[in-house]
């Protein structure tokens, strides 16, 4: 394998994380991130050792994951500060800055039954062709929703491993919603006078305890609800006799969605390709006891979708747009599994497992930042030929990974970026010897 030397653009980003490590540990950290960003082969500690130009024993890279002293919490905090500094924050209609975090889970297939945390989990993402259950790890991820070159993207921040109740001690068992709360508690949030923290999640994290905790901590929650949810009117009419009533008249969301007059707004979501009709109502959720805004989304030939928001100041259009941007975390899972070695770890210690996954997420986030810088050079210098299927926008994560691999192998900067077609031809073409090497080879045969 070739030795990978990071270019200046990537190394300047890696220097941001130097306070989290000692000098020897930072050198191993650079080797891991450069290897993961390049995406060469199966991304394990052995691959990092083979591609690193440093003279170090191969066991040092395994011990960097299992027993070296460095904090994942500090690494996530530095990454969050870097993303906020370089990408900025989204502003709502009232001019407030919103720090949008995304929660979701994914499955990583593993065949070893002796590996820590491996169990059979219900498959809700891979399709029926792969079976209803998969053997592997169940990861809960927290990501930051940013906009790069006008397009929303999700950058991974932190991970937690879910273990089934029957496979761990009772004191160590945590549900996915409890793991999500631990991720939010461990994150070092930035501060600001007009900063609003917002969490986006799917229906799997619509837990009443998690929502109440977020409201107590001043965190807004936007999640998917049920069409048959028990909702009550805010106005409580008292009869004058007996104990005072706590709940108003019930509101049926199914009947509310069946009335055509309630859908007063139409917007376009998912890159302005899908027209969606919106209807909104404010009520008190019976299960959580919170006052929520319920937004009903209706598209052609689809069942209505119900969204719940604890922030009543957000308009229905903003709630629908933010939840549509939440889908970027699914694309991030695909990039992590296909190009950044999310499931390539071959370790048994839980700490080494968790650190490997965190480094893969960090490499994915830094590659997305480099794709933004690549787009800036593309528009200014015109050195990159645009792909025929994308008229405008930043390069994809995989294209940036190919260019980064070329720069690391050539020890060059991002001044001369090759086209993706040149990279494909270069990977398929056989290596030719120069005239001097050919003459030396013939003389050696004689």
Where are these regions (language model features)?
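A short, flexible helix-boundary coil/loop motif
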Residues: 1-28, 36-37, 148-161, 173, ...
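Short, conserved catalytic/metal-binding motifs centered on acidic residues
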Residues: 48, 97-111, 142, 197-206, ...
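Gly/serine-rich nucleotide phosphate-binding loop at the start of the catalytic core
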Residues: 1-73, 79
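Active-site-proximal, Lys/Arg-enriched surface segment
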Residues: 69-163, 275-281
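Extended, non-catalytic structural segments that build the interaction scaffolds
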Residues: 31-38, 303-327
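Domain-level cores of phosphate- or acyl-group-handling catalytic modules
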Residues: 166-241
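Short amphipathic alpha-helical "interface-anchor" segments enriched in bulky aromatics
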Residues: 107, 254, 316-347
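Electropositive, glycine- and tryptophan-enriched low-complexity nucleic-acid-binding patches
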Residues: 59-63, 125-195, 291-306
């Amino acid at each position: 394998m070739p030795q990978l030397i990071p270019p200046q653009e990537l190394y300047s980003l890696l220097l941001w994380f130097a306070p989290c490590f000692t000098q020897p540990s930072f050198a191993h950290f650079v080797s891991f991130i450069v290897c993961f960003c390049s995406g060469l082969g199966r991304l394990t500690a052995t691959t990092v050792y083979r591609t690193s130009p440093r003279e170090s024993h191969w066991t040092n890279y395994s011990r960097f994951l299992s027993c070296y002293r460095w904090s994942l919490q500090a690494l996530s905090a530095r990454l969050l500060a870097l993303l906020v500094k370089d990408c900025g924050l989204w502003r709502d209609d009232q001019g407030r800055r919103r720090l949008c975090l995304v929660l979701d889970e994914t499955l990583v297939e593993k065949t070893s039954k002796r590996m820590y945390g491996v169990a059979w989990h219900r498959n809700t993402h891979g399709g029926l062709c792969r079976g209803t259950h998969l053997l592997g790890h169940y990861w809960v991820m927290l990501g930051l929703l940013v906009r790069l070159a006008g397009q929303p993207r999700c950058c991974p921040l932190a991970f937690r491993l879910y273990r089934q109740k029957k496979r761990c001690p009772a004191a160590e068992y945590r549900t996915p919603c409890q793991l999500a709360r631990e991720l939010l508690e461990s994150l070092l949030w930035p501060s600001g006078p007009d900063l609003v923290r917002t969490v986006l999640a799917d229906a799997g994290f619509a837990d009443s305890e998690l929502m109440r905790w977020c409201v107590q901590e001043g965190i807004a929650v936007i999640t998917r609800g049920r069409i048959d949810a028990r909702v009550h009117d805010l106005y409580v009419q008292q009869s004058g006799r007996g104990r005072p009533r706590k709940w108003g008249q019930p509101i049926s969301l199914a009947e509310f969605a069946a009335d055509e007059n309630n859908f007063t707004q139409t917007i376009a979501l998912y890159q302005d390709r899908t027209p969606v009709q919106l209807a909104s109502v404010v009520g008190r959720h019976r299960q959580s006891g919170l006052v929520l805004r319920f937004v009903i989304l209706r598209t052609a030939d689809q069942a209505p979708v119900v969204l719940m928001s604890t922030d009543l100041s957000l308009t229905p259009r903003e709630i629908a747009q933010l939840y549509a941007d939440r889908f970027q975390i699914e694309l991030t899972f695909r990039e992590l599994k296909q190009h950044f070695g999310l499931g390539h770890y071959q370790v048994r210690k839980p700490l080494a497992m968790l650190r490997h996954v965190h480094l893969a997420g960090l490499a994915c986030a830094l590659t997305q930042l480099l794709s933004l810088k690549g787009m800036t050079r593309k528009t200014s210098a015109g050195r990159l030929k645009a792909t025929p299927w994308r008229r405008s926008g930043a390069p994809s994560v995989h294209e940036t990974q190919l260019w980064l691999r070329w720069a690391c192998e050539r020890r060059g900067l991002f001044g001369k970026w090759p086209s993706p077609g040149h990279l494909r031809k270069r990977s398929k073409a056989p290596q030719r010897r120069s005239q001097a090497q050919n003459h030396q080879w013939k003389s050696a045969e004689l």
